[in-house]
Amino acid sequence: ETATAYVESSIPNLRQYLYEVPVSEKRLEELNYLAYRVKWMDSQDEAVFGTVIEMMKPETLQDIINLSCNMDKFRYLPGVTTEVKLGEHLLKGNADMAMEEQAARSNYEGIGKDYIKKHGGMFHAFGYTSGSQEELEPIYRGKELPDPNYKQTCSFKVWVYKGNPYDNYTLTLPATESKMDALKSAMGISNWSKCKQLAIQCRVPTLWDWLPEYSSIEELNDLVTEHCQGMENRQEPVLEM
């Protein structure tokens, strides 16, 4: 008789694709690998990943692992949560459009709906996610699992809340300004002073020694961003002339 694993996850839509997984040593390795990658996703990453799963409808655990390694192939627009906001975003991004033409096309909702009809994609609590023209790479072919940190660049994960500590959100750092704004919008706050930090987790243990004092999430993100950029610059190869 084959044992079966029932997977629970905070990732939207994931459970229905991993509801019953036949247990084997290989499957447990794959589940453990996926669990590590999910561990370093924040609230927005989870929403995007769940949306990608819903759009792509993976058939196997291998497919889901490959999706987790191809997240950069999907387009995420933080804060774009309605057809109206999508239409506004698309027009703002087209700086070459004449003012008269923009005025004629100022039906933002219609523009957003037309775009979705042509390109697909779905809205979620934090924004809009759609596919791209790039082909997905088969990073995992069923034999050797890829690097668990493949294309995951966060250094810290912060838990924040407003009001009830059990109703918390997570944010991985460094984060872009648009991603931070999308989280504030989802939390219903205008600035970071309106929320409190519940916990912080460090991906690389040695970074605990580096972590300086900070007065806000925004300041911490600036410090982490600067530190990561400095590390990247030191790792860049020097070309000999």
Predicted features, each with a name:
Residues 107, 239-241:
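Non-Sec secretion/translocation targeting segments of pathogen effectors
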Residues 1-40, 170, 174-223:
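N-terminal interaction modules that seed assembly of large macromolecular complexes
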Residues 7, 24-27, 42-45, 54-57, ...:
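Intrinsic-disorder-associated interaction segments
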Residues 66, 75-155, 160-168:
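Extended, well-ordered protein cores
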